[in-house]
Regions:
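Bacterial N-terminal signal peptides
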Residues: 9-18
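N-terminal segments that cap or nucleate solenoid repeat domains
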Residues: 24-64
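Ankyrin repeat A-helix N-terminal signature
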Residues: 31-35, 64-70, 97-103, 130-136, ...
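Conserved ankyrin/ankyrin-like repeat signature
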Residues: 40, 72-73, 105-106, 138-139, ...
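Ankyrin repeat domain, specifically the short helix-to-loop turn at the C-terminus of the second helix
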Residues: 45-50, 75-83, 108-116, 141-149, ...
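Ankyrin repeat boundary/linker residues
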Residues: 55, 88, 121, 154-155, ...
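Start-of-repeat signature of ankyrin repeats
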Residues: 58, 91, 124, 157-158, ...
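Leucine-rich solenoid repeat scaffolds
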Residues: 478-516
């Protein structure tokens, strides 16, 4: 059976060759225009050359004239009977090319000559979508005048022209489409990922999709696009399949002016997404996320926020609306960069609060704002890690983001700890659970065997003597041992069970031993 396949293939190719030889006209005119030989092309047209003779891939002289952005050549071709309603084997048409290069003159010539006003490609992408993507409002207006379907949906991602305009920050096009009755609340296709597990196995976050035009505007930061959509009665709180609202989207993308506008227009600040992230949590998360850092397995990220509204303003605004200051995550939030951020910000898992999130980053400003609004100072995550334990350095791993922050990390930690202690944080609170089934589901590897440890273990792990001294001065006990029977000093001298924390430091050893003598 295998031996017959080459013979069959040869026969098919021979048949195609015979067919092609008889069907394809002389493409010399198309070749000349493609080569940019305008003078020769005009002479050929005047001499009666076949103006519809296509190249092997179906591209006609008219398509190449459009590509060359040549209105005069197009006019000559159309006058000789060139077909405007034609596509090549790639699904490209003269009209799609004219819209792509944003030449209104070419577009009008083609429409008047009978071009298909939709001219979709193989994925159903219409020329109105191209105009929306480019921000070509006059071309979009012309297409609509000739009957373009304002609500056409392409088949690849289920997106509309309105979504493209909002995503590319073209408010004038958004206004035009809304005025022409574009559906403002239709959502793009969503991926119902049955499993997000690799062969390792490990969960890997994959975006679900299902965004509306307002969500695209929120993601791109186009505040005027959002205003136009809201004026067209877009649902300000309509979430994605993951529960992410336009407000969450704006905050998550550092668009604080837009987020503020959404709240002023009635966006609900009491929503939460699949992971349990509320607008307050995301605002604190973005405030605590440094503008420049090394991403896990990724490049350095440099973010410049130009909005007049600061992230701290958004935290205060959301809190002023009366939201719960202590929402807790359902699970580890999706990672920036498309993965679960294994080994990065390990404590931001089930039960994490905005205060814990701020404490992980030693973000004293956010901590102070939250405490002023009665955030619970000792509310822990599922493992029992409190904000004070987190601020002291607990949850270390080789890829932890904290050593990548700029500036004096011990100074940041101390500023945060002072606020937490002043608010009544328990300096001897212990990690409660890293071994139960529930804890293991949420537990990162860096927290293995840390059950029973206190905040004092954190600076010992890092070698932060100033932080250790602060905790000792505020009542931290040296005689508490973890579930493996090791105290803070044991970690310095012997390391832990996994040998992660073996950091011999003479100054720290002396500090802990002296404190142990004093307390006994």
């Amino acid at each position: 059976m295998r031996a017959l396949k080459p013979l069959i293939a040869t026969a098919v190719l021979s048949a195609l060759t015979v067919f092609s030889t008889g069907a394809v006209a002389d493409p010399t005119l198309a070749d000349a225009i493609r080569a940019g030989d305008r003078a020769t092309a005009l002479k050929m047209i005047q001499g009666g050359a076949d103006v519809n003779a296509a190249q092997a891939d179906g591209t006609t002289p008219l398509q190449w004239a459009t590509y060359r952005n040549d209105p005069e050549l197009m006019k000559a071709l159309l006058a000789r009977g060139a077909k405007a309603k034609v596509t090549n084997s790639f699904g490209a048409s003269p009209l799609s090319e004219a819209v792509k290069i944003a030449n209104l003159d070419l577009v009008m010539q083609l429409l008047k000559a009978g071009a298909d006003v939709e001219s979709p490609n193989a994925d159903g992408q219409t020329v109105l979508m191209l105009a929306a993507h480019n921000g070509s409002v006059e071309i979009a207006r012309a297409l609509l005048k000739y009957g373009a379907n304002v609500n056409a949906v392409e088949t690849w991602r289920g997106q509309t022209a309105l979504m493209w305009a909002a995503a590319e920050k073209h408010p004038e096009v958004v206004e035009l489409l809304v005025a022409q009755h574009a559906k403002v609340d239709v959502a793009a296709s969503a991926n119902d990922w049955g499993e997000q597990i690799t062969s390792e196995p490990r969960a890997q976050y994959r975006p679900t999709g299902g965004l509306t035009a307002l969500m695209y505007a929120a993601r791109s930061g186009c505040i005027e696009c959002a205003r136009a959509l809201l004026k067209g009665h877009a649902d300000i709180n309509m979430p994605s399949p993951d529960g992410v609202t336009p407000l969450l989207t704006a905050l998550d993308n550092l668009h604080y002016d837009l987020a503020k506008m959404l709240i002023e227009q009635g966006a609900n600040p009491n929503t939460w997404d699949w992971w349990g992230r509320t607008p307050l949590y995301v605002a604190v998360d973005m405030h605590s996320y440094p503008s420049s850092r090394i991403a896990y397995n990724g490049p350095k990220v440099n973010v410049v926020v130009t909005d007049k509204t600061r992230c701290s303003d958004m935290i205060r605004l959301i809190l002023a609306s009366g939201v719960n200051p202590n929402p807790q995550l359902n699970m580890h939030r999706p990672g920036r960069g498309g993965n679960s951020q294994r080994f990065v910000e390990n404590l931001l898992t089930t039960g994490a609060t905005p205060l814990l999130r701020a404490a992980v980053a030693q973000d004293a400003e956010a901590v102070e704002i939250l405490l002023e609004r009665q955030a619970l100072v000792d509310l822990p995550n599922v493992m029992g890690v409190t904000p004070l334990i987190a601020a002291s350095g607990m949850g270390i791993s080789i890829n932890d983001p904290r050593p990548l922050f700029e500036g004096d990390m011990q100074g940041r930690a101390l500023a945060t700890l002072e606020l937490l202690v002043k608010a009544g944080a328990d300096v001897n609170a212990r990690v409660l659970d890293t071994t139960s089934h529930n804890a293991k589901i949420a537990r990162p590897s860096s927290m293995t065997d840390r059950q029973g440890q206190t905040a004092l273990y954190g600076p010992v792990i890092w070698g932060w003597t100033r932080v250790a001294r602060f905790l000792l001065d505020h009542g931290a006990r040296t005689d508490i041992v973890d579930a493996t029977g090791k105290g803070p000093l044991d970690l310095i001298l012997k390391g832990d069970v996994a040998n992660r924390d073996h950091k011999t430091d003479d100054e720290m050893v002396s500090l802990i031993r002296t404190a142990a003598v004093v307390t006994h």
